[in-house]
Amino acid sequence: MGQSHLDIGVGTGYYPAKSLKAGAKCTEITLLDLSPNSLQATEQRILETVGREAVRVNTVVASALEPLPFDKAKKFNSISVFFLLHCMPGTPEEKCKLFDVVRPHLAEDGVLVGTTVLGQGVPINWLGQKMMNSYNNNTKSFHNSEDNKAQFDEGLRRNFEEVDSWIMGQVMLFKARKPRQQDAITNVVPKDNLD
């Protein structure tokens, strides 16, 4: 976690709170999520973990698939996207828009890290498959039946010069550095134009 950090899809705030408690040198953390409740709970968790004097916390209600509501010059030393992509509706190509919108806000020497649960191309036992079907079809808490490593790698490589990704079980972990300077070319079509 860098001095200035952006956490997207904050969930319960477990990861930033754990990093700060372990001694991360972060002095400013920006939390971005669609849920004001998640943002409030995460901010509270962080402040209870390290104290208001240790880190400045900013909260932003916004979509990770739209241009981020920051000045173009705003850069973060690190950006995290933990266990978010598999919860986002849309195709893998549409989800890769996230990499397009975070790239301009990652410092030249910064790092993007993340994880997601894949729906294709990874081994899964019958119980895991049953749970995945339930999460995707019954509870609608997952939207990852088409998600695969190759397409996420492509989206990352389109935006970053250095990409490292690997699989642990059914989870893809990734790390990306050196944001490309030119605008990323994306094949994402806005949902309004799908007819």
Curated annotation (Swiss-Prot):
List the protein's name.
O-methyltransferase
Q: Please explain the role this protein plays, according to its UniProt record.
A: O-methyltransferase; part of the gene cluster that mediates the biosynthesis of pyrophen and campyrone B, which represent a class of fungal amino acid-derived alpha-pyrone natural products. The first step of pyrophen biosynthesis is catalyzed by the PKS-NRPS hybrid synthetase ATPKS that uptakes and condensates L-phenylalanine and malonyl-CoA in order to produce desmethyldesacetylpyrophen.
Question: Which GO terms label this protein's molecular function in UniProt?
Answer: methyltransferase activity
Q: Which organism is it from?
A: Aspergillus niger (strain ATCC 1015 / CBS 113.46 / FGSC A1144 / LSHB Ac4 / NCTC 3858a / NRRL 328 / USDA 3528.7)
Q: Which GO terms describe its biological process?
A: methylation
Origin superkingdom = Eukaryota
Q: Name one Pfam family in it.
A: Methyltransf_12
Coiled coil feature spans: none
- Family, as annotated: Belongs to the methyltransferase superfamily.
Q: What is its EC number?
A: 2.1.1.-
User: InterPro entries from the entry?
Assistant: Methyltransf_12 (IPR013217), SAM-dependent_MTases_sf (IPR029063)
Q: Which UniProt keywords apply?
A: Methyltransferase, Transferase
- Record field: transmembrane: none
Q: In which pathway does it act?
A: Secondary metabolite biosynthesis
User: Looking at its record, which EC class is this enzyme?
Assistant: transferase
Q: Which cysteines are joined by disulfide bonds?
A: none
